[in-house]
Amino acid sequence: MYYVTMKMVRNEEAYIFRSFFKSFKENFKQATIINVIMLIVAVLLYLDTNIAGNMGQTTGKILRMIFAVFTLLYVMVLLYVYPVLAKFYNSIKNTFKNAFLMAIRHLPFTFLMLVICVCPLAIFFIPSFQIQMSLILLFILFGPAVIAYANSHFFVKIFDRYIPKEPDPEEAEVMP
């Protein structure tokens, strides 16, 4: 999805479905392995946090704080790993490494994107159940794509720093 939304932000692609399925096909194997790794890490973080919650007062609090930091780092990597996969050709190891380094290096953008991802939770604070259900339905239909599109504006700015500029043919000197 990020492959298409980043192209949309740059006004580069006219065929949304064709581009989506092309990128899906190209990245399927790596994305599946990344999904499994991220799932395993999420389960381990969840289990460790629960175990820390059942420990003694001081030790449990310290471990919960440590796992909260690891969870934040996990979410930051999760935010970047799929856009990095969609934009760059890397090994899985380098995709994770680059996602982590970019998330840390561009911390203000990272936190803005996290806020964008968390904003839909505001739906649950709307007092009317009927409005909540309508908004939840809209979010299920359009939410992930809208969030990806909004975050893609930031990813384009971030990734442009890592992509070498091609010389403009008009600016290049013609040798006689």
Where in this protein do the model-derived segments appear?
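Hydrophobic alpha-helical membrane segments
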Residues: 1-176
